[in-house]
Amino acid sequence: MIPRRLPALLGIALGAALSGACTKEVKLKMAVQVVSQPEAAEVRYRGKSIGAAPTDVSINTYEDLQSILAVKGDLDVVEKRLRIQAPDKAQLIFKFGKGEQSPLAKVLGVQNVLIFDYSEKVAFDSDKFDLKPDALPILNTQADILNVYFPKAQVFVCGYTDSTGTDEHNLRLSLKRAQAVADYLVARGVDKERLKIRGFGKDYAVESNATPAGRALNRRTEVILPQ
């Protein structure tokens, strides 16, 4: 299903589409807070230790983001999540484990995952599935990242809600939001055959649904790459 506002949104994005998609270096100017679970992992940037998580890094390109690493003893990174908070602000969350998969990786049938996490606040109005115009710059960059750095990789686009509302409504809304993001990425040149659309409703919450702040983080759409 193509969102009702998609043609208008594509018009807004056309200039960026013509200027950015063919470059070999994707610009990604962001203030990034690096976080680890468990806490206090050693953070390395461009091969040098910059202290323990949480810590802040300013980046200018996707290569800069790729060069941020975290180490926690003999534990493995089982999930890496870039939580987009605004077009110029994000958290990079390293989740560690020992010989295990994250629950989401298990259900998707992959070992580890790199997740681009778009909260409802960034991408959608409450209970809607039309993309916000403010979300387009970062989704343009997302498409460029997929086309330049992961041109053949399978990509999961997954939607989620909080625990309020009925299961039926939440599943339907989460799927429509995932489809809206996928349609936009395809319009930006990502091969639709690579995209797998999933709607999980309230499942796989990243925070507790007991608080407004937690529910806000659970209302999200993710672009997920197997690692």
Task: Cite the ranges covered by each PLM segment.
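Bacterial Sec signal peptide processing site at the extreme N-terminus
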Residues: 22-35
